[in-house]
Amino acid sequence: MLPNTGKLAGCTVFITGASRGIGKAIALKAAKDGANIVIAAKTTQRHPKLLGTIYTAAEEIEAAGGKALPCVVDVRDEQQINSAVEKAVERFGGIDILVNNASAISLTNTLETPTKRVDLMMSVNTRGTYLTSKACIPFLKKSKVAHILNLSPPLNLNPMWFKQHCAYTIAKYGMSMCVLGMAEEFRGEIAVNALWPRTAIHTAAMDMLGGAGVESQCRKVDIIADAAYSIFKRPKSFTGNFIIDENILKEEGIKDFDIYAITPGHPLLPDFFLDEHPDAVMEEKESYDPVPEVKEEKLQLQEQPQLQEQPQLQEKPQLQEQPQLQEKPQLQEQPQLQEQPQLQEQPQQQPQLQEQPQLQEKPQLQEQPQQQEKPQPQQQPQQQPQQRPQQRPQPQPQPQPLLQSVLPPKPHFGAVEETFRIVKDSLSDEVVRATQAVYQFELSGEDGGTWFLDLKSKGGKVGHGEPSDRADVVMSMATEDFVKMFSGKLKPTMAFMSGKLKIKGNIALAIKLEKLMTHMNSRL
Protein backbone atom coordinates (compact mmCIF):
# COMPACT_ATOMS: atom_id res chain seq x y z
CA MET A 1 0.00 0.00 0.00
CA LEU A 2 1.01 3.61 -0.50
CA PRO A 3 3.03 4.90 2.47
CA ASN A 4 2.20 8.18 4.17
CA THR A 5 4.73 11.00 3.78
CA GLY A 6 3.37 13.61 6.19
CA LYS A 7 2.41 15.84 3.26
CA LEU A 8 -1.04 16.57 4.71
CA ALA A 9 0.08 17.46 8.23
CA GLY A 10 -1.94 20.43 9.46
CA CYS A 11 -4.18 20.48 6.36
CA THR A 12 -7.93 20.65 6.81
CA VAL A 13 -9.88 18.10 4.77
CA PHE A 14 -13.66 18.49 4.43
CA ILE A 15 -15.24 15.13 3.46
CA THR A 16 -18.92 14.49 2.76
CA GLY A 17 -20.23 11.03 3.58
CA ALA A 18 -17.23 10.35 5.84
CA SER A 19 -18.95 8.31 8.54
CA ARG A 20 -18.26 5.02 6.76
CA GLY A 21 -16.95 3.37 3.61
CA ILE A 22 -14.79 5.23 1.11
CA GLY A 23 -15.21 8.60 2.81
CA LYS A 24 -13.98 7.29 6.15
CA ALA A 25 -11.09 5.45 4.49
CA ILE A 26 -9.87 8.70 2.88
CA ALA A 27 -10.26 10.45 6.24
CA LEU A 28 -8.18 7.83 8.06
CA LYS A 29 -5.45 7.98 5.42
CA ALA A 30 -5.15 11.76 5.81
CA ALA A 31 -5.36 11.47 9.61
CA LYS A 32 -2.17 9.40 9.63
CA ASP A 33 -0.37 12.52 8.39
CA GLY A 34 -1.87 14.57 11.21
CA ALA A 35 -4.56 16.27 9.13
CA ASN A 36 -7.70 17.94 10.43
CA ILE A 37 -10.80 16.10 9.23
CA VAL A 38 -14.29 17.57 8.96
CA ILE A 39 -16.74 14.64 8.95
CA ALA A 40 -19.77 15.99 7.06
CA ALA A 41 -22.37 13.21 7.15
CA LYS A 42 -25.93 12.45 8.27
CA THR A 43 -25.57 9.44 10.54
CA THR A 44 -25.65 10.30 14.22
CA GLN A 45 -27.10 7.07 15.60
CA ARG A 46 -26.08 3.47 15.04
CA HIS A 47 -27.92 1.65 12.28
CA PRO A 48 -28.57 -2.12 12.48
CA LYS A 49 -27.23 -2.68 8.95
CA LEU A 50 -25.00 0.35 8.31
CA LEU A 51 -22.07 0.51 10.70
CA GLY A 52 -20.60 3.81 11.80
CA THR A 53 -21.69 7.31 12.77
CA ILE A 54 -19.99 10.69 12.54
CA TYR A 55 -18.96 10.23 16.18
CA THR A 56 -17.47 6.75 15.85
CA ALA A 57 -15.61 7.96 12.75
CA ALA A 58 -14.26 10.90 14.77
CA GLU A 59 -12.92 8.50 17.40
CA GLU A 60 -11.10 6.46 14.74
CA ILE A 61 -9.64 9.58 13.16
CA GLU A 62 -8.32 10.83 16.49
CA ALA A 63 -6.83 7.40 17.18
CA ALA A 64 -5.08 7.48 13.77
CA GLY A 65 -3.34 10.76 14.62
CA GLY A 66 -5.66 13.38 13.18
CA LYS A 67 -8.07 15.93 14.59
CA ALA A 68 -11.76 15.44 13.93
CA LEU A 69 -14.78 17.72 13.70
CA PRO A 70 -18.03 15.76 13.31
CA CYS A 71 -20.78 17.82 11.64
CA VAL A 72 -24.34 16.75 10.89
CA VAL A 73 -24.71 17.44 7.18
CA ASP A 74 -27.32 16.37 4.67
CA VAL A 75 -25.88 17.72 1.42
CA ARG A 76 -29.43 18.37 0.20
CA ASP A 77 -29.66 21.07 2.87
CA GLU A 78 -27.66 24.16 1.87
CA GLN A 79 -27.95 25.64 5.35
CA GLN A 80 -26.36 22.56 6.94
CA ILE A 81 -23.53 22.71 4.39
CA ASN A 82 -22.82 26.37 5.08
CA SER A 83 -22.98 25.81 8.83
CA ALA A 84 -20.44 22.98 8.66
CA VAL A 85 -18.09 25.09 6.53
CA GLU A 86 -18.30 27.94 9.04
CA LYS A 87 -17.53 25.57 11.93
CA ALA A 88 -14.57 24.11 10.04
CA VAL A 89 -13.07 27.53 9.36
CA GLU A 90 -13.69 28.64 12.94
CA ARG A 91 -12.11 25.47 14.36
CA PHE A 92 -9.17 24.95 11.99
CA GLY A 93 -8.69 28.35 10.35
CA GLY A 94 -9.58 27.37 6.80
CA ILE A 95 -10.19 24.52 4.34
CA ASP A 96 -7.48 23.02 2.13
CA ILE A 97 -9.13 19.97 0.58
CA LEU A 98 -12.73 19.11 -0.25
CA VAL A 99 -13.80 15.53 -1.00
CA ASN A 100 -17.30 15.22 -2.51
CA ASN A 101 -17.99 11.60 -1.64
CA ALA A 102 -21.67 11.59 -0.59
CA SER A 103 -23.76 9.78 -3.18
CA ALA A 104 -27.14 8.11 -3.74
CA ILE A 105 -27.70 5.18 -6.10
CA SER A 106 -30.63 3.35 -7.67
CA LEU A 107 -29.88 0.95 -10.51
CA THR A 108 -33.38 1.04 -11.96
CA ASN A 109 -34.58 1.88 -15.43
CA THR A 110 -36.71 4.88 -16.35
CA LEU A 111 -40.14 3.34 -15.73
CA GLU A 112 -39.06 1.65 -12.49
CA THR A 113 -37.47 4.75 -10.91
CA PRO A 114 -39.94 6.74 -8.77
CA THR A 115 -39.74 10.52 -9.05
CA LYS A 116 -38.81 10.66 -5.37
CA ARG A 117 -35.75 8.50 -6.05
CA VAL A 118 -34.80 10.62 -9.07
CA ASP A 119 -34.96 13.75 -6.92
CA LEU A 120 -32.84 12.08 -4.24
CA MET A 121 -30.05 11.16 -6.66
CA MET A 122 -30.05 14.54 -8.37
CA SER A 123 -30.10 16.38 -5.05
CA VAL A 124 -27.35 14.36 -3.38
CA ASN A 125 -25.04 13.63 -6.29
CA THR A 126 -25.18 16.67 -8.55
CA ARG A 127 -26.73 19.45 -6.48
CA GLY A 128 -25.02 18.41 -3.23
CA THR A 129 -21.61 18.34 -4.91
CA TYR A 130 -22.19 21.72 -6.51
CA LEU A 131 -23.40 23.42 -3.32
CA THR A 132 -20.67 21.98 -1.11
CA SER A 133 -18.02 23.04 -3.61
CA LYS A 134 -19.55 26.51 -3.83
CA ALA A 135 -19.47 26.89 -0.04
CA CYS A 136 -15.84 25.74 0.27
CA ILE A 137 -14.31 27.53 -2.75
CA PRO A 138 -13.83 30.96 -1.10
CA PHE A 139 -11.65 29.31 1.56
CA LEU A 140 -9.96 26.87 -0.81
CA LYS A 141 -8.76 29.81 -2.91
CA LYS A 142 -6.76 30.99 0.10
CA SER A 143 -4.97 27.64 0.50
CA LYS A 144 -1.57 26.85 -0.99
CA VAL A 145 -2.55 23.18 -1.52
CA ALA A 146 -6.18 23.58 -2.59
CA HIS A 147 -7.88 20.47 -3.99
CA ILE A 148 -11.44 19.44 -4.81
CA LEU A 149 -11.87 15.72 -5.42
CA ASN A 150 -15.18 14.29 -6.62
CA LEU A 151 -15.82 10.56 -6.42
CA SER A 152 -17.32 10.37 -9.91
CA PRO A 153 -16.63 8.59 -13.20
CA PRO A 154 -15.12 9.69 -16.50
CA LEU A 155 -17.72 11.15 -18.87
CA ASN A 156 -18.35 8.08 -20.99
CA LEU A 157 -21.19 8.55 -23.49
CA ASN A 158 -21.49 4.87 -24.38
CA PRO A 159 -25.30 4.35 -24.31
CA MET A 160 -24.96 1.09 -22.39
CA TRP A 161 -24.18 3.11 -19.25
CA PHE A 162 -27.45 5.04 -19.59
CA LYS A 163 -29.84 2.36 -20.78
CA GLN A 164 -30.57 0.47 -17.55
CA HIS A 165 -30.09 3.27 -14.98
CA CYS A 166 -30.50 6.56 -16.81
CA ALA A 167 -31.32 8.68 -13.74
CA TYR A 168 -28.33 7.41 -11.75
CA THR A 169 -25.97 7.99 -14.66
CA ILE A 170 -27.21 11.54 -15.20
CA ALA A 171 -26.85 12.31 -11.48
CA LYS A 172 -23.36 10.83 -11.29
CA TYR A 173 -22.22 12.54 -14.48
CA GLY A 174 -23.42 15.81 -12.94
CA MET A 175 -20.62 15.42 -10.40
CA SER A 176 -18.16 14.82 -13.22
CA MET A 177 -19.36 17.89 -15.09
CA CYS A 178 -18.62 19.94 -11.98
CA VAL A 179 -15.02 18.76 -12.39
CA LEU A 180 -15.02 19.68 -16.06
CA GLY A 181 -16.29 23.20 -15.42
CA MET A 182 -14.69 24.10 -12.10
CA ALA A 183 -11.25 22.85 -13.12
CA GLU A 184 -11.22 25.44 -15.88
CA GLU A 185 -12.97 28.14 -13.87
CA PHE A 186 -10.47 27.96 -11.00
CA ARG A 187 -7.38 26.91 -12.92
CA GLY A 188 -4.26 28.07 -11.10
CA GLU A 189 -6.16 28.47 -7.81
CA ILE A 190 -7.71 25.09 -7.06
CA ALA A 191 -6.96 21.64 -8.44
CA VAL A 192 -10.28 19.98 -9.33
CA ASN A 193 -10.25 16.29 -10.24
CA ALA A 194 -12.42 13.16 -10.27
CA LEU A 195 -11.48 9.72 -8.94
CA TRP A 196 -13.16 6.45 -9.88
CA PRO A 197 -12.33 2.79 -9.14
CA ARG A 198 -11.51 0.30 -11.86
CA THR A 199 -13.27 -2.48 -9.94
CA ALA A 200 -16.11 -2.77 -7.47
CA ILE A 201 -15.24 -1.56 -3.97
CA HIS A 202 -16.59 -3.39 -0.94
CA THR A 203 -18.96 -1.05 0.87
CA ALA A 204 -22.36 -1.34 2.51
CA ALA A 205 -23.91 -0.13 -0.73
CA MET A 206 -22.21 -2.92 -2.69
CA ASP A 207 -23.48 -5.50 -0.21
CA MET A 208 -27.03 -4.27 -0.80
CA LEU A 209 -26.61 -4.25 -4.58
CA GLY A 210 -24.73 -7.51 -4.98
CA GLY A 211 -26.00 -9.60 -2.10
CA ALA A 212 -24.15 -12.16 -0.03
CA GLY A 213 -20.79 -13.22 -1.37
CA VAL A 214 -20.21 -10.14 -3.53
CA GLU A 215 -17.30 -9.02 -1.35
CA SER A 216 -15.03 -11.68 -2.86
CA GLN A 217 -15.30 -9.83 -6.19
CA CYS A 218 -14.39 -6.47 -4.66
CA ARG A 219 -11.36 -4.53 -3.56
CA LYS A 220 -10.97 -2.83 -0.20
CA VAL A 221 -11.71 0.86 0.30
CA ASP A 222 -7.98 1.29 0.96
CA ILE A 223 -7.24 1.45 -2.77
CA ILE A 224 -9.41 4.58 -3.13
CA ALA A 225 -7.83 6.11 -0.02
CA ASP A 226 -4.33 5.55 -1.41
CA ALA A 227 -5.30 6.94 -4.82
CA ALA A 228 -6.86 10.03 -3.22
CA TYR A 229 -3.73 10.56 -1.11
CA SER A 230 -1.61 10.41 -4.26
CA ILE A 231 -3.77 13.14 -5.82
CA PHE A 232 -3.57 15.38 -2.74
CA LYS A 233 0.23 15.29 -2.88
CA ARG A 234 0.22 16.87 -6.32
CA PRO A 235 0.34 20.60 -7.13
CA LYS A 236 -2.58 22.82 -8.14
CA SER A 237 -1.52 22.49 -11.77
CA PHE A 238 -2.69 18.87 -11.65
CA THR A 239 -6.30 19.64 -12.49
CA GLY A 240 -9.20 18.64 -14.74
CA ASN A 241 -8.32 14.94 -14.64
CA PHE A 242 -10.61 11.91 -14.51
CA ILE A 243 -8.45 9.44 -12.66
CA ILE A 244 -8.78 5.67 -12.31
CA ASP A 245 -7.45 4.43 -8.97
CA GLU A 246 -5.29 1.67 -10.37
CA ASN A 247 -3.67 3.92 -12.97
CA ILE A 248 -2.45 6.57 -10.56
CA LEU A 249 -1.18 3.96 -8.12
CA LYS A 250 0.83 2.36 -10.90
CA GLU A 251 2.50 5.75 -11.30
CA GLU A 252 3.33 5.54 -7.60
CA GLY A 253 5.08 2.23 -8.20
CA ILE A 254 2.36 -0.13 -6.95
CA LYS A 255 2.56 -3.39 -8.90
CA ASP A 256 0.81 -5.98 -6.75
CA PHE A 257 -2.86 -5.03 -6.52
CA ASP A 258 -3.81 -8.24 -4.75
CA ILE A 259 -2.97 -6.36 -1.54
CA TYR A 260 -6.19 -4.43 -2.08
CA ALA A 261 -8.35 -7.47 -2.87
CA ILE A 262 -10.84 -8.81 -0.35
CA THR A 263 -10.04 -12.28 -1.68
CA PRO A 264 -6.61 -12.24 -3.36
CA GLY A 265 -6.62 -14.01 -6.71
CA HIS A 266 -10.41 -14.01 -7.04
CA PRO A 267 -11.92 -12.53 -10.25
CA LEU A 268 -12.98 -8.92 -9.71
CA LEU A 269 -16.18 -7.21 -10.76
CA PRO A 270 -15.48 -4.25 -13.09
CA ASP A 271 -17.01 -0.97 -12.00
CA PHE A 272 -19.57 1.03 -13.94
CA PHE A 273 -18.82 3.51 -16.71
CA LEU A 274 -15.50 2.06 -17.85
CA ASP A 275 -15.03 0.57 -21.32
CA GLU A 276 -11.76 -1.00 -20.26
CA HIS A 277 -12.83 -4.60 -20.70
CA PRO A 278 -13.09 -4.64 -24.52
CA ASP A 279 -14.52 -8.11 -25.00
CA ALA A 280 -17.20 -7.68 -22.38
CA VAL A 281 -18.11 -4.17 -23.50
CA MET A 282 -18.33 -5.08 -27.19
CA GLU A 283 -20.49 -8.11 -26.39
CA GLU A 284 -22.78 -5.86 -24.37
CA LYS A 285 -22.92 -3.17 -27.05
CA GLU A 286 -23.75 -5.74 -29.71
CA SER A 287 -26.49 -7.12 -27.53
CA TYR A 288 -28.63 -4.02 -27.92
CA ASP A 289 -27.16 -1.35 -30.15
CA PRO A 290 -24.95 -1.68 -33.22
CA VAL A 291 -25.98 -5.13 -34.38
CA PRO A 292 -29.74 -4.49 -34.29
CA GLU A 293 -29.28 -1.25 -36.23
CA VAL A 294 -27.06 -2.93 -38.79
CA LYS A 295 -29.60 -5.68 -39.21
CA GLU A 296 -32.47 -3.23 -39.61
CA GLU A 297 -30.53 -1.43 -42.33
CA LYS A 298 -29.94 -4.70 -44.13
CA LEU A 299 -33.54 -5.72 -43.77
CA GLN A 300 -34.63 -2.44 -45.32
CA LEU A 301 -32.51 -3.19 -48.34
CA GLN A 302 -34.09 -6.63 -48.59
CA GLU A 303 -37.66 -6.00 -47.53
CA GLN A 304 -38.62 -2.49 -48.59
CA PRO A 305 -39.40 -2.61 -52.30
CA GLN A 306 -39.03 1.13 -52.72
CA LEU A 307 -35.32 0.86 -51.96
CA GLN A 308 -34.79 -1.81 -54.58
CA GLU A 309 -37.13 -0.33 -57.16
CA GLN A 310 -35.50 3.07 -57.18
CA PRO A 311 -33.89 3.25 -60.61
CA GLN A 312 -31.03 5.39 -59.42
CA LEU A 313 -29.79 2.56 -57.23
CA GLN A 314 -29.65 0.24 -60.20
CA GLU A 315 -28.78 2.59 -63.03
CA LYS A 316 -26.53 5.26 -61.63
CA PRO A 317 -22.88 4.36 -61.91
CA GLN A 318 -22.33 6.01 -58.57
CA LEU A 319 -23.73 2.88 -56.96
CA GLN A 320 -20.45 1.13 -57.54
CA GLU A 321 -18.59 3.97 -55.89
CA GLN A 322 -21.16 4.11 -53.08
CA PRO A 323 -21.02 7.83 -52.35
CA GLN A 324 -24.70 7.77 -51.46
CA LEU A 325 -24.26 5.04 -48.87
CA GLN A 326 -21.37 6.83 -47.26
CA GLU A 327 -23.24 10.12 -47.20
CA LYS A 328 -26.48 8.85 -45.71
CA PRO A 329 -27.08 10.73 -42.42
CA GLN A 330 -28.26 7.66 -40.58
CA LEU A 331 -25.00 5.83 -41.22
CA GLN A 332 -22.84 8.76 -40.23
CA GLU A 333 -24.79 9.35 -37.04
CA GLN A 334 -24.07 5.86 -35.81
CA PRO A 335 -20.42 5.73 -34.75
CA GLN A 336 -20.60 2.01 -34.30
CA LEU A 337 -21.40 1.64 -38.00
CA GLN A 338 -18.30 3.57 -38.92
CA GLU A 339 -16.25 1.11 -36.94
CA GLN A 340 -17.43 -1.73 -39.15
CA PRO A 341 -16.06 -1.05 -42.64
CA GLN A 342 -17.77 -4.07 -44.06
CA LEU A 343 -21.05 -2.16 -43.91
CA GLN A 344 -19.82 0.07 -46.73
CA GLU A 345 -18.59 -2.87 -48.74
CA GLN A 346 -21.68 -5.01 -48.47
CA PRO A 347 -23.42 -3.72 -51.62
CA GLN A 348 -20.37 -4.99 -53.55
CA GLN A 349 -19.63 -7.99 -51.36
CA GLN A 350 -23.06 -9.25 -50.44
CA PRO A 351 -21.84 -12.68 -49.28
CA GLN A 352 -20.73 -11.01 -46.06
CA LEU A 353 -24.37 -10.90 -45.04
CA GLN A 354 -24.37 -14.66 -44.96
CA GLU A 355 -21.04 -14.88 -43.19
CA GLN A 356 -22.47 -13.24 -40.10
CA PRO A 357 -24.47 -15.98 -38.36
CA GLN A 358 -25.04 -13.71 -35.40
CA LEU A 359 -27.65 -11.88 -37.48
CA GLN A 360 -29.81 -14.93 -37.07
CA GLU A 361 -29.22 -15.08 -33.35
CA LYS A 362 -31.45 -12.07 -32.69
CA PRO A 363 -34.99 -13.31 -31.87
CA GLN A 364 -36.63 -10.15 -33.16
CA LEU A 365 -35.20 -10.68 -36.64
CA GLN A 366 -36.28 -14.28 -36.85
CA GLU A 367 -39.85 -13.25 -36.16
CA GLN A 368 -39.89 -11.58 -39.57
CA PRO A 369 -40.68 -14.25 -42.14
CA GLN A 370 -39.26 -12.12 -44.95
CA GLN A 371 -35.80 -12.93 -43.73
CA GLN A 372 -36.34 -16.58 -44.62
CA GLU A 373 -37.73 -15.80 -48.08
CA LYS A 374 -35.17 -13.20 -49.13
CA PRO A 375 -36.60 -12.81 -52.65
CA GLN A 376 -34.88 -9.52 -53.37
CA PRO A 377 -31.23 -10.58 -53.02
CA GLN A 378 -31.94 -13.25 -55.64
CA GLN A 379 -33.26 -10.62 -58.05
CA GLN A 380 -30.43 -8.15 -57.65
CA PRO A 381 -27.83 -10.10 -59.64
CA GLN A 382 -30.36 -10.40 -62.50
CA GLN A 383 -31.05 -6.67 -62.50
CA GLN A 384 -27.39 -5.70 -62.53
CA PRO A 385 -25.47 -8.60 -64.05
CA GLN A 386 -22.87 -6.36 -65.64
CA GLN A 387 -22.14 -4.28 -62.58
CA ARG A 388 -21.87 -6.96 -59.93
CA PRO A 389 -21.37 -10.40 -61.39
CA GLN A 390 -19.77 -11.48 -58.13
CA GLN A 391 -23.23 -11.47 -56.52
CA ARG A 392 -24.48 -14.53 -58.43
CA PRO A 393 -23.42 -17.03 -55.72
CA GLN A 394 -25.33 -15.07 -53.08
CA PRO A 395 -28.72 -16.84 -53.31
CA GLN A 396 -27.05 -20.19 -52.59
CA PRO A 397 -28.17 -21.42 -49.13
CA GLN A 398 -25.54 -21.27 -46.41
CA PRO A 399 -25.11 -23.88 -43.65
CA GLN A 400 -27.09 -22.75 -40.64
CA PRO A 401 -25.29 -22.58 -37.29
CA LEU A 402 -26.55 -24.56 -34.35
CA LEU A 403 -28.00 -21.39 -32.86
CA GLN A 404 -30.64 -21.40 -35.60
CA SER A 405 -32.22 -24.33 -33.80
CA VAL A 406 -32.00 -22.47 -30.49
CA LEU A 407 -33.78 -19.41 -31.83
CA PRO A 408 -36.96 -20.38 -33.67
CA PRO A 409 -38.98 -17.52 -35.16
CA LYS A 410 -41.72 -17.68 -32.51
CA PRO A 411 -42.11 -17.54 -29.60
CA HIS A 412 -39.37 -16.59 -27.12
CA PHE A 413 -40.54 -19.43 -24.91
CA GLY A 414 -39.44 -21.84 -27.62
CA ALA A 415 -36.00 -20.27 -27.68
CA VAL A 416 -35.69 -20.66 -23.92
CA GLU A 417 -36.91 -24.25 -24.03
CA GLU A 418 -34.52 -25.14 -26.82
CA THR A 419 -31.66 -23.43 -25.00
CA PHE A 420 -32.30 -25.55 -21.92
CA ARG A 421 -32.45 -28.65 -24.09
CA ILE A 422 -28.99 -27.95 -25.46
CA VAL A 423 -27.74 -27.07 -21.97
CA LYS A 424 -29.05 -30.43 -20.77
CA ASP A 425 -27.18 -32.22 -23.55
CA SER A 426 -24.00 -30.44 -22.47
CA LEU A 427 -24.16 -31.60 -18.86
CA SER A 428 -22.20 -34.42 -17.31
CA ASP A 429 -21.45 -35.89 -13.90
CA GLU A 430 -18.14 -34.05 -14.01
CA VAL A 431 -19.89 -30.69 -14.48
CA VAL A 432 -22.27 -31.49 -11.63
CA ARG A 433 -19.41 -32.43 -9.29
CA ALA A 434 -17.53 -29.25 -10.16
CA THR A 435 -20.53 -26.93 -9.73
CA GLN A 436 -22.81 -28.30 -6.99
CA ALA A 437 -25.45 -25.61 -7.26
CA VAL A 438 -29.10 -25.14 -8.16
CA TYR A 439 -29.98 -22.13 -10.32
CA GLN A 440 -33.43 -20.63 -10.75
CA PHE A 441 -34.23 -18.26 -13.62
CA GLU A 442 -37.09 -15.77 -13.40
CA LEU A 443 -37.65 -14.67 -17.00
CA SER A 444 -39.78 -11.62 -17.73
CA GLY A 445 -41.33 -10.22 -20.86
CA GLU A 446 -43.07 -12.11 -23.62
CA ASP A 447 -43.54 -15.79 -22.69
CA GLY A 448 -41.55 -15.37 -19.48
CA GLY A 449 -41.65 -17.84 -16.65
CA THR A 450 -39.65 -19.77 -14.06
CA TRP A 451 -36.98 -22.28 -15.08
CA PHE A 452 -34.27 -24.14 -13.23
CA LEU A 453 -30.87 -25.71 -13.76
CA ASP A 454 -30.07 -28.33 -11.12
CA LEU A 455 -26.35 -29.07 -11.00
CA LYS A 456 -26.52 -31.00 -7.75
CA SER A 457 -28.55 -34.00 -8.87
CA LYS A 458 -26.78 -36.82 -10.67
CA GLY A 459 -26.29 -35.98 -14.32
CA GLY A 460 -27.92 -32.57 -13.87
CA LYS A 461 -31.52 -31.54 -14.47
CA VAL A 462 -33.26 -28.71 -16.27
CA GLY A 463 -36.91 -27.84 -16.48
CA HIS A 464 -39.80 -25.40 -16.32
CA GLY A 465 -40.99 -24.29 -12.89
CA GLU A 466 -39.24 -24.11 -9.55
CA PRO A 467 -36.56 -26.69 -8.66
CA SER A 468 -37.35 -29.43 -6.15
CA ASP A 469 -34.48 -28.24 -3.95
CA ARG A 470 -34.09 -24.64 -2.86
CA ALA A 471 -32.14 -22.59 -5.40
CA ASP A 472 -28.68 -21.38 -4.41
CA VAL A 473 -28.87 -18.57 -6.97
CA VAL A 474 -31.91 -16.80 -8.42
CA MET A 475 -31.33 -14.85 -11.62
CA SER A 476 -33.94 -12.43 -12.97
CA MET A 477 -33.80 -11.11 -16.54
CA ALA A 478 -35.71 -10.77 -19.79
CA THR A 479 -36.17 -13.90 -21.92
CA GLU A 480 -34.31 -12.30 -24.79
CA ASP A 481 -31.31 -11.48 -22.58
CA PHE A 482 -31.34 -15.02 -21.20
CA VAL A 483 -30.97 -16.50 -24.68
CA LYS A 484 -28.21 -14.02 -25.53
CA MET A 485 -26.40 -14.82 -22.31
CA PHE A 486 -26.37 -18.57 -22.84
CA SER A 487 -25.43 -18.19 -26.50
CA GLY A 488 -22.41 -16.02 -25.67
CA LYS A 489 -23.79 -12.74 -27.00
CA LEU A 490 -24.16 -11.21 -23.53
CA LYS A 491 -21.70 -11.85 -20.73
CA PRO A 492 -23.28 -12.32 -17.29
CA THR A 493 -20.85 -9.86 -15.67
CA MET A 494 -21.82 -7.08 -18.07
CA ALA A 495 -25.50 -8.01 -17.81
CA PHE A 496 -25.25 -7.64 -14.03
CA MET A 497 -23.32 -4.36 -14.19
CA SER A 498 -25.72 -2.85 -16.72
CA GLY A 499 -28.79 -3.85 -14.71
CA LYS A 500 -30.10 -6.43 -17.17
CA LEU A 501 -29.41 -9.26 -14.74
CA LYS A 502 -30.39 -9.27 -11.07
CA ILE A 503 -28.86 -11.89 -8.81
CA LYS A 504 -29.98 -13.14 -5.42
CA GLY A 505 -28.03 -15.71 -3.51
CA ASN A 506 -24.47 -17.00 -3.70
CA ILE A 507 -22.45 -14.77 -6.06
CA ALA A 508 -19.55 -17.23 -6.11
CA LEU A 509 -21.87 -19.91 -7.54
CA ALA A 510 -23.15 -17.39 -10.08
CA ILE A 511 -19.56 -16.96 -11.27
CA LYS A 512 -19.28 -20.73 -11.63
CA LEU A 513 -22.26 -20.64 -13.97
CA GLU A 514 -20.57 -17.95 -16.06
CA LYS A 515 -17.56 -20.23 -16.49
CA LEU A 516 -19.89 -23.09 -17.42
CA MET A 517 -21.55 -20.88 -20.05
CA THR A 518 -18.17 -20.16 -21.59
CA HIS A 519 -17.58 -23.89 -21.86
CA MET A 520 -21.00 -24.49 -23.44
CA ASN A 521 -20.89 -21.61 -25.94
CA SER A 522 -19.20 -23.83 -28.51
CA ARG A 523 -22.28 -26.05 -28.53
CA LEU A 524 -24.79 -23.22 -28.30
From Swiss-Prot:
Active-site positions on this chain: 168 (proton acceptor)
Location of this chain's protein in the cell: Peroxisome; Mitochondrion
Residue(s) carrying N6-acetyllysine: 116
Region (Disordered): 283-410
Compositional bias per record (Basic and acidic residues), positions renumbered to this chain: 283-300
Coiled coil (UniProt feature): none
Pfam families noted in UniProt: adh_short, SCP2
GO cellular component terms given for this protein: mitochondrion; peroxisome
Low complexity bias (residue ranges): 301-391
Record-listed NADP(+) binding positions: 17-23, 42, 74, 172
PANTHER family assigned to the protein according to its UniProt record, in alphabetical order: HYDROXYSTEROID DEHYDROGENASE-LIKE PROTEIN 2
Function noted in UniProt: Has apparently no steroid dehydrogenase activity. Controls bile acid (BA) and lipid metabolism in response to nutritional cues.
Family of this protein: Belongs to the short-chain dehydrogenases/reductases (SDR) family.
Name of this protein: Hydroxysteroid dehydrogenase-like protein 2
Biological source species: Rattus norvegicus
